[in-house]
């Protein structure tokens, strides 16, 4: 390390973001933006799931009748499961469509801003209907399902675009987006508990709580949109997001001819800083991801089936060869072969599907079937799951605690041991709520730990060499996750309806 670089490091060490592993404020702001985007993906779903009593009794508030009795108990007793099924069904269809050439040709910014805007309509509808009231409970059912379908569309747009944006970034940024998914869930659960404790449980109190609760959700969406707007002008983000980099070049009037986007071959080049010959690498910490990039040997470009399991090296030290000048993100993705990417990462895609399938298979539906006398049972179950998920994703911020792809496979099937135990609780063979509380925390912990890493290993594998491939890999991970959630929630619906 030279005297000059040591002096720079010494002057930066006092900065708060440097102590957290970020070398510049722009880098830290990029990380925060991805956390907010992750939060926005799950914001409405987390808000609805964290207020199970409000949803299952929505017909009371929507009709304005405190004494109303459910006319369709089959739906209202399983309202959360119906909501999840509708949301995930719509989401998986939209996410699959996002891989088509037509959808990939639409700029990421346009799709993402649309996805961030839809939740405003969802939350306003949820709040406005009880304020205006509707005459029938069937109308309340329609509101729940319309909000679910809109939520699925919004989540798909936000999820696929966020994955495409974060895929080329170093691993810690994708972990930040994944962390945001659980931060919002835990945050909304805590807010719901605070509101329930601090306010009453009368008809009017619940309406007031819902307005405060969902109003907070609207505020979070505003923050995410503002952060995304600023991200377009962030020099660190422009280094990895081709669309933002090309826009910056156009603003400066530096538009250079680029290859036609019809080209099937990835562009080559390097806009990220690489070390000069003979220069030693300088890292902030031995365990921290390096921001510098490295070229890869030519013999590593063979697309082998399941290569993610045998991959060696560190993707964060590799150069993405299509990060060139004014190429856009859509051009990068159109040049990537979806099938070639799928072949290399399919073991992690299967893990993502299995983990989230089993999660939605028993949570929240089957856990809610446990005979419990406490009116707090459902709220505590949701909070404990979110807490376990949150803790797991925090642990993954520490590099040495991240499991390898092979360990992810072991964890994926090991967590299935929770299912027979919760079935025994539902059937009454194991009485009380103590064991369900322990099981749901462990289920959330393994969901966050192995589920997150299965998604991270998809784009952040050394077997991929282009930013377009990493974006597609991250989108495939999102689709596998959504397929698991969709099939799991629908299977859970079938179980709870026949119980």
UniProtKB/Swiss-Prot annotation:
Biased amino acid composition, Basic and acidic residues: 255-267
MF-aspect GO terms: nucleoside transmembrane transporter activity
Effect of residue 393 to K: Slightly reduces inosine and guanosine transport. Moderately reduces sensitivity to formycin B. No significant effects on protein localization to cell membrane
Bilayer-spanning residue ranges: 31-51, 112-132, 133-153, 179-199, 212-232, 350-370, 378-398, 406-426, 428-448, 475-495
Chain positions covered by the region annotation Disordered: 255-276
Reaction it catalyzes: inosine(in) + H(+)(in) = inosine(out) + H(+)(out); guanosine(in) + H(+)(in) = guanosine(out) + H(+)(out); xanthosine(in) + H(+)(in) = xanthosine(out) + H(+)(out)
Cellular compartments annotated: Cell membrane; Cell projection, Cilium, Flagellum
Entry keyword ATP-binding: no
Keyword Glycoprotein attached: yes
Positions annotated as glycosylated: 326
Recorded consequence of changing residue 175 to I: No significant effects on inosine and guanosine transport. No significant effects on protein localization to cell membrane
Pfam families: Nucleoside_tran (PF01733)
Top-rank lineage group of the source organism: Eukaryota
UniProt-listed InterPro entries: Eqnu_transpt, MFS_trans_sf
Keywords annotated in UniProt: Cell membrane, Cell projection, Cilium, Flagellum, Glycoprotein, Membrane, Transmembrane, Transmembrane helix, Transport
Bilayer topology annotation: Multi-pass membrane protein
Parts of the chain on the Cytoplasmic side: 1-30
A single cellular component GO annotation: motile cilium
Note: Can transport formycin B, a toxic inosine analog, but not tubercidin, a toxic adenosine analog.
Family per similarity comment: Belongs to the SLC29A/ENT transporter (TC 2.A.57) family.
General function of this protein: High affinity nucleoside:H(+) symporter; transports inosine and guanosine. Can transport xanthosine.
PANTHER family (alphabetical): EQUILIBRATIVE NUCLEOSIDE TRANSPORTER, TRANSPORTER 2, PUTATIVE-RELATED
Protein's name according to its UniProt entry: Nucleoside transporter 2
